[in-house]
């Protein structure tokens, strides 16, 4: 439910979101957000301290986004998260930006690749909703 509240915040900031987007590195980002200026944010969702400690794949995400955030519930202390990331405190109904993430502008080829991945994943998911039986693997 952290993802739902976070997506609501991102939409209020002018972003469209997609969950579980496969990245060129082979990893999957919890939430990827894209705005009309082409900015790409990745949000890694953490539900516990153990979740953060056990999962270090987020370090790979920075090369695929302009800004990297962690979203978590108010039960977790902010101090456990890396200092060079943004922090979003969320629940099932909404979220607020605790601190902004520093910007690391993507190179143009990476931005294009990520934008195309975002668009293709979104279109495929819509097509599966419209025609669930007519969608085999490409």
Give the label of every model feature segment.
Residues 13-15, 39, 66:
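Short coil/turn segments at beta-strand junctions that form active-site/ligand-binding loops
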Residues 2, 27, 53-57:
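Amphipathic coiled-coil/heptad-repeat helices and related helical stalk/stem segments
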Residues 20-22, 44-51:
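Short, flexible loop segments at the rims of nucleotide/cofactor-binding pockets, characterized by
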Residues 25, 39, 51, 76, ...:
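Surface-exposed, flexible loop/turn segments at secondary-structure boundaries
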Residues 10-11, 36, 62-63:
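Flexible, charged surface loops at secondary-structure boundaries
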């Amino acid at each position: 439910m952290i993802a739902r509240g976070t997506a609501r915040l991102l939409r209020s900031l002018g972003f469209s979101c997609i969950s579980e987007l496969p990245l060129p590195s082979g990893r999957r980002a919890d939430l990827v957000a894209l705005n009309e200026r082409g900015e790409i944010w990745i949000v890694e969702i953490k539900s516990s301290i153990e979740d953060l400690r056990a999962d270090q794949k987020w370090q790979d995400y920075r090369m695929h986004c302009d800004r990297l955030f962690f979203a978590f519930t108010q039960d977790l202390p902010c101090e456990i998260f890396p200092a060079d990331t943004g922090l979003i405190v969320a629940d099932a109904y909404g979220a607020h930006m605790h601190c902004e993430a520093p910007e690391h502008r993507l190179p143009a080829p990476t931005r294009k690749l990520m934008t195309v991945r975002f668009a293709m994943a979104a279109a495929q998911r819509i097509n599966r909703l419209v025609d669930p039986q007519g969608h085999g693997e490409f």
